[in-house]
Design a protein with these regions (language model features):
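Active-site-adjacent structural elements that line small-molecule/cofactor binding pockets in enzymes
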Residues: 1-305
C-alpha cells in the first residue's frame, strides 16, 4: 500500500515555508504522495453542517491556500512523490480552464499528477462562484467528457447542454497518456456508479473497514457490469486522525484514537486491499514540527507492520 501525506494548505501553517518544509520532509521520510484540499469560503453561518463529526466546520478552513498553486510549489521542491488533490471541486471553474491547469501541472511535474475530483458539501461556496447547486451530477459528467476530449484529441470541439468549446488545436498534451488518472470522491449510489464507469478510482474518507470494503465491492461490481476491468481501478483513502492521549474504544476507530491505533488501522486497510492511504494532520492542535515528527512515526509504524 502506498502512503501519502496532506500538505498544510489550511490553517496557520498554510504558508510557503509550511508547504516547502512538509514537501521535503515527506520525500525524505519515504512518503509516496502529497495531497491538497479545496475551499473557497469559511462562512460565519454555513447553510449546511459540516458532514463529519459534530457538524462544525474546522477552524483551519478559515485560512486556505489554492490547491493547484500549492501543488506547483510542492512539485518544485520534490522529485519523486506523486501529487494529488483530495479533493478539487470539479465545478468551480469552466472545464476548459480546469483542463488547461491540470494539463500544465502534469507537464511541469513530469507526470506526477493524480486528479481527485469532488462536488463539495456546502451550497454557500457554489453561490460564491456563481455555479448552480442543483444539477451537479450532470455538470460533473460533462466536465469529465471535456477533460477526456481535451486530453485525447489534437483537434477538439464540444457542444453540450452546459458548455460550448469552438473547434481548437490542442497542442499541449499531458505527460501521462491518455491523461492523468482521475479519481472521484463519492458516497451516493449514483456517485459510486460514476466512479465505476468513468473514473480511474475512488477517494473515500476513513470509515470502518467492513463498510469501506462493502462500498468498494459495489464499485467493482458496477465496473464489471459496465465492461471495465475492475483490477484497473484503485482506492486512495483519506484519514483525518483525531488523536487521543488514551486508547480509544474499538468502535470509535477511525473517528478517534491514539497514533498507534491509527497505525493499526492503516495496516488493516492494507490487508483489506486499500491501494493508497494518506493522512491529513492539519486539523490537529499540534505545531508543524510536531506534526512532521508524528508523520515520521506514522509511516515508520505502518511500514514496520
Amino acid at each position: 500500500m502506498r502512503i501519502g501525506l496532506a500538505l498544510p494548505t489550511f490553517g496557520p501553517d498554510a504558508t510557503a515555508e509550511g508547504v516547502v518544509g512538509v514537501s521535503r520532509s515527506a520525500e525524505e521520510l519515504g512518503y509516496d504522495s502529497l495531497w491538497t484540499g479545496d475551499r473557497v469560503l469559511a462562512p460565519t453561518s454555513p447553510s449546511a453542517p459540516y458532514p463529519v463529526g459534530d457538524g462544525v466546520m474546522p477552524r483551519a478552513y478559515e485560512r486556505h491556500l489554492d490547491p493547484l498553486l500549492s501543488m506547483t510549489l510542492a512539485a518544485a521542491h520534490t522529485e519523486r512523490v506523486r501529487l494529488g488533490t483530495s479533493t478539487l471541486n470539479a465545478l468551480w471553474q469552466p472545464p476548459l480552464m480546469l483542463a488547461r491547469s491540470l494539463t500544465t501541472l502534469d507537464v511541469l511535474t513530469g507526470g506526477r499528477l493524480d486528479v481527485g475530483l469532488g462536488l463539495g458539501w456546502m451550497p454557500d461556496e457554489y453561490a460564491a462562484v456563481d455555479v448552480p447547486w442543483q444539477g451537479r451530477g450532470g455538470r460533473l459528467d460533462e466536465t469529465l467528457d471535456i477533460l477526456h476530449g481535451y486530453w485525447t484529441h489534437d483537434i477538439y470541439a464540444h457542444q453540450g447542454p452546459l458548455f460550448t468549446i469552438p473547434e481548437t488545436v490542442v497542442g499541449l498534451k499531458p505527460h501521462q497518456r491518455p491523461g492523468p488518472p482521475v479519481l472521484l470522491a463519492a458516497f451516493t449510489a449514483a456517485g459510486l456508479r460514476r466512479v465505476a464507469r468513468r473514473a480511474a478510482g475512488w477517494l473515500p474518507v476513513a470509515m470502518p473497514l467492513l463498510y469501506l470494503t462493502g462500498l468498494w465491492a459495489t464499485i467493482l461490481h458496477e465496473a464489471e457490469d459496465a465492461g471495465r476491468d475492475p483490477s484497473t481501478l484503485r482506492m486512495a483513502l483519506r484519514v483525518n486522525p483525531a488523536l487521543t492521549a488514551e486508547k480509544a474504544e474499538p468502535e470509535r476507530i477511525p473517528d478517534a484514537g491514539t497514533l498507534e491505533q491509527y497505525i493499526d488501522y492503516a495496516r488493516a486497510a492494507a490487508e483489506a486491499g486499500v491501494h493508497e492511504l494518506f493522512i491529513d494532520l492539519g486539523q490537529s492542535p499540534l505545531t508543524l514540527e510536531e506534526r512532521t515528527d508524528m508523520a515520521g512515526r506514522f509511516i515508520e509504524g505502518v511500514r514496520a507492520g
